[in-house]
Regions:
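Short, conserved, GDST-rich strand-edge loop motifs in beta-rich repeat architectures
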Residues: 38-48, 96-107, 153-174
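A short beta-strand motif characteristic of beta-propeller blades
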Residues: 69-74, 125-129, 204-209, 252-257, ...
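Asp-box/WD-like beta-propeller blade repeats and closely related beta-sheet repeat scaffolds
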Residues: 124-216
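N-terminal secretory signal peptides and thylakoid transit peptides that target proteins
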Residues: 1-18
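Beta-rich, blade/repeat-based domains predominating
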Residues: 78-88, 133-143, 202-224, 258-275, ...
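Short loop/turn segments immediately following the C-termini of beta-strands
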Residues: 40-42, 98-100, 153, 233, ...
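Short loop/turn segments immediately following beta-strands, especially the blade-tip
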Residues: 58-64, 115-121, 183-191, 242-248, ...
Length: 418
């Protein structure tokens, strides 16, 4: 299979008997596990292959291998799929179309609903809503499956207007708003129009290219569903919101001004303890924060580097995930092309480096664990592949399984058992 995995490739494999829904592997629950992979069409460090849309794979839980099931049709080839979220009921997949004008009306990006076929894991488009911002970079869903949150990144370049002040013409620069939008999930599983939108502070930070305005890059829910955390890499802010169960509003919590220039990007909550881990894109570091879901308070515990001290070339961390067992946290490095592994002290939240492992590809923009935590799947955007690693739950170490699949410009991996 070449780097440009297409529908033609899929049907060739089908004819060869290599893609068969009836032969899909069994997940631990007795259901079959499927992986859903987002592909970019445009963005920094674009990568290999003609990207766009979403690819579906069956997961062999004995080996961690991915077998192609389908790729979205030609109507989605221009869909710049930035991030994915699966409804906890396993019946719906939500995706961002990370563009500035999904409808050619310059009204920002979009969020799409796909219904997951409960027999073979395939997906079908079921609805679209505006994301309430430009370049929606992230989407997440709460544990009840009733609310979706979207982080809208905004452009790096401003719009330029000419205004007259006291009769004197002047140039005025207007940047897109960085926003966090909340969308209710309707009874049929599709998304309703946004019920609330938080507009991030219109300010700037250190870097004169990437930090001239707010850039919301992620928003995630704490396990109790009472608090959400949004990362603004443009202005070095971490925002918390109170989101009581059943509420469809974003009540302002606390705003943390991080160290200038570090660019907080993605977050991952500990499954049981009051810690959230945030990766910092411009500092090549990972921070642990302690939080109180009732008050939405948050405070810094520790920050650790994600690359070796002797590495001096360009690097920008991208993704972060706490292992399902809660003992380890992992971060991906674009540039060093690796995964940093840290052991978590459950009493304090402090991290100890376990090791740094190459991802066997370039630009690992995203990665994820299967729900059991047995395997880690690294999405190497730059080389257009997903590499499988076996996870040692006791030591946290990663071992390549030898399983690798070509996917055009992969940026996010999510799972559903059907």
């Amino acid at each position: 299979m070449n780097n440009d995995f297409s529908r033609r490739d899929f049907f060739a494999l089908l004819g060869a008997g290599l893609v068969a829904g009836a032969a899909a592997p069994q997940a631990q629950s007795g259901k079959r596990l499927f992986a859903y992979v987002a592909s970019w069409t445009s963005g920094p460090g674009i990568g290999v292959g003609n990207g766009g849309g979403i690819s579906v794979f069956s997961v062999d839980m004995a080996t961690g291998a991915l077998a192609p099931v389908m790729r979205t049709g030609p109507e989605f080839d221009r869909m710049n799929t930035g991030y994915l979220a699966v409804n906890p009921n396993g019946r719906f997949l939500y995706a961002t179309n990370e563009v500035e004008s999904y409808d050619n009306e310059y009204g920002g990006g979009a969020v799409l609903t796909f219904a997951i076929n409960q027999v073979d894991g395939t997906i079908a488009h079921a609805g679209t809503q505006p994301s309430m911002g430009v370049w929606p970079a992230y989407i997440s869903i709460d544990a009840s499956g009733s609310r979706v949150a979207v982080a809208n990144h905004g452009n790096y370049d401003p719009s330029v207007r000419v205004v007259k002040k006291n009769g004197v013409p002047e140039i005025e620069k207007v940047w897109d708003d960085g926003t966090v939008a909340l969308l209710p999930v309707k009874a049929d599983g599709t998304l309703d129009r946004p019920s609330d939108v938080a507009i991030l502070e219109r300010t700037q930070s250190v870097d004169k290219v990437t930090q001239r305005s707010a850039h919301a890059h992620s928003v995630n829910w704490d396990p109790s569903q009472r608090m959400a955390v949004a990362c603004d890499k443009g202005c070095d802010r971490v925002y918390t919101y109170r989101v009581a169960n059943g509420s469809h509003t974003l009540a302002e919590g606390k705003t943390v001004k991080t160290e200038p220039g570090i660019a907080p990007r993605h977050s991952s909550f500990h499954p049981r303890l009051p810690y959230v881990f945030i990766v910092n894109e411009r500092q090549s570091s990972l921070s642990c924060y302690r939080y109180d879901a009732t008050t939405a308070d948050i405070s810094l515990v520790q920050t650790m580097p994600t690359i070796p001290a002797e590495y001096t070339m360009n690097n920008s961390p991208a993704d972060v995930h706490v292992h399902p067992n809660g003992r380890f946290v992992y971060s991906s490095n674009r540039g060093h092309n690796s995964l940093a592994i840290f052991r978590i002290d459950e009493g304090s939240g402090r991290m100890t480096l376990v090791g740094i492992v190459p991802t066997q590809g370039a630009t690992p923009r995203g990665f994820n664990f299967d729900p059991s935590g047995r395997f880690l799947f690294a999405a190497n955007q730059g080389t257009g592949n997903i590499v499988t690693f076996a996870v040692d739950g006791d030591s946290g170490t990663l071992t390549p399984t030898g399983a690798k699949v070509d996917v055009p410009r992969p940026v996010c991996v999510q799972f559903a058992a059907v």
